[in-house]
Every structure is written in structure tokens, then in C-alpha cells.
């Protein structure tokens, strides 16, 4: 079977049934440039960190990964991963703050590298939008900063 790649992005001679299990079919990405801060104790969207992807089959896996610099002078910055309007990536444990990622700084000022990864199986072939949201736990200094630092608005992305 011959495969032809065209300058406009089309590929002839390749279809889903001829691809081996585990093949990467779609790839989308988002990048946060600059900084964002919040004092909110309820979740807010992180601007520029959302992607829409359409699974090719009902058993398609969607792999989501992220890495960012986070600063919170006291206590905890909390993040959750959403598929459309539903929170996903909830750990199986109970109690405490159970979301995709938390950053507890314990009164240590600085920019902390925070990462997460999750694979999702939406179970259909509809387009889905994945996004990351953040909030603060409050504390004596409630502001959460991403891509920056508590005492400096410069970008550290």
C-alpha cells in the first residue's frame, strides 16, 4: 500500500483500519503565554489553556498533560481538569483537596514547577473541550500566580 502526503495536509492511502493499535491520530495543544493571577476561592478558567478534540472512535483515549510555574505565598493553589462542564481526573481517595493537581507552598515564596497528566476516554465521537481551572484555598495571602512570581509580575513561563 502506498501512502502519499500532500502539501495541503491530506494523506492518501492511509485510513483508520490500516493503522496499528496505539497509533496517534489527532494532536492538539494549548500554550499559556504570560501570567495570570486570582484571589478566587471558586474555580476560574485559566485563559488560553483549553483544547477541543474530536475522538475518532468511542474507545479513543485522550492524553492530557500540562506543566506550569505556580506561586502561592501561603497555603495551597488548587487546579482541576474539565471535559466540557464535567470535572475529570478525580483521584479515588477521599478527604482533603481531591483534584488533578495541588501546590502547597507552606509559606515558602517562590515559583514552583507543577505538572500533571491524565488519559481520558469520553466514550463517544463528539467534540470535547478540555480546560484547566484554578482557585486558591484562601490563606493569609490568597493570590495564586501562574507563569509569574508573588513579588514580581515578570513571566517565568
What are these regions (language model features)?
Residues 31, 36-42, 52-61, 65-127, ...:
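Terminal beta-strand-rich extracellular "head" domains
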Residues 45-48:
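Short, solvent-exposed loop/turn segments enriched in Ser/Thr/Gly
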Residues 2-35:
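Glycine-rich, low-complexity segments
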Residues 9-10, 50-52:
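Generic alpha-helical hydrophobic packing signal
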Residues 1, 24-25, 152-157:
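Short intrinsically disordered, low-complexity coil segments enriched in acidic
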Amino acid at each position: 500500500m502506498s501512502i502519499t502526503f500532500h502539501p495541503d495536509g491530506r494523506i492518501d492511502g492511509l485510513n483508520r483500519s490500516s493503522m496499528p493499535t496505539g497509533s496517534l491520530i489527532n494532536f492538539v495543544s494549548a500554550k499559556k503565554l504570560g501570567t495570570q493571577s486570582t484571589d478566587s476561592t471558586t474555580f476560574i478558567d485559566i485563559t488560553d489553556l483549553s483544547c477541543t478534540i474530536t475522538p475518532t472512535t468511542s474507545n479513543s483515549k485522550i492524553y492530557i498533560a500540562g506543566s506550569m510555574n505556580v506561586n502561592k505565598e501561603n497555603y495551597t493553589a488548587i487546579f482541576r481538569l474539565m471535559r466540557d462542564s464535567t470535572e475529570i481526573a478525580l483521584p479515588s481517595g477521599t478527604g482533603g483537596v481531591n483534584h488533578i493537581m495541588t501546590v502547597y507552598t507552606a509559606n515558602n515564596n517562590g515559583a514552583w514547577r507543577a505538572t500533571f497528566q491524565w488519559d481520558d476516554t469520553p466514550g463517544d465521537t463528539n467534540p470535547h473541550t478540555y480546560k484547566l481551572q484554578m482557585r486558591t484555598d484562601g490563606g493569609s495571602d490568597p493570590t495564586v500566580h501562574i507563569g509569574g512570581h508573588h513579588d514580581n509580575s515578570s513571566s517565568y513561563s
